[in-house]
Amino acid sequence: MKQIFILFLLWFGLSLSAQDQISLLFVGDLMQHQAQIDAARQGDGYNYNDCFRHVKKEISEADMAIGNLEVTLGGKPYRGYPAFSAPDEYLHAIKEAGFDVLLTANNHCLDKGKLGLERTILMLDSLKIHHAGTYRNPEERHKSYPLLIEKNGFRIVLLNYTYGTNGLKTDAPNVVNYINREQIKKDILDARRKLPDVIIACMHWGVEYCSFPERSECELANWLIEQGVDHVIGSHPHVLQPMEIVKDPRTPARHVIAVSYTHLRAHETVL
């Protein structure tokens, strides 16, 4: 039987033989506030060599590492909150740390408008980093979404959606994956046609700095499982919220629902 481990910078799962198993590591929001950008400034460029030094081992040891890229790579001027545009060197550091997949559907993906969305995709493609959530046009989305990755004999599908984009509207022909049940249901059907071993929905939702999820998130998570999603991973609140493992009443399967798993790189203090 194939076994999938889901990790949150801590090992999660059962001790099994190395055969027919894969480890997936999910981390929270990868951000760049102004203090971080200023601290990385070095001469005419930016140096992020030490950015992930304390967690690089865990990231690189996972078979697949997935993070939420909650900045744009919109070019200069580089800015932190409220409209993020991170230096390209930050993405290089993320790649060097061992990340394989970055999620881009979040409330900051339109911070630098059409240019920022498209340049972010261009940079991700240039470094051959898999990504899901935003697209230059509908044709690009149709071609590459749902995101299917084959690794260690596994077929893994990743879905990614956001609750909103801070009131900013998407400029045609760009596409942002917003949370829309009708569209998500179609995407899940498309995902199932790819005959994956697992479908994981990565949702950008919830209330910032709230220790517990809203009822609407719990209902949506359960709906996703009912539609055929195997696991649900959440982001946006910037704090760790309860995680549960749900037994499937119809099969021996167990579903991980992690509503929020906080951020990995940011410059914020929660009291």
Identify the meaning behind each predicted range.
Residues 4-13:
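Sec-dependent N-terminal signal peptides
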Residues 19-265, 271:
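Acidic, metal/ion-coordinating pockets
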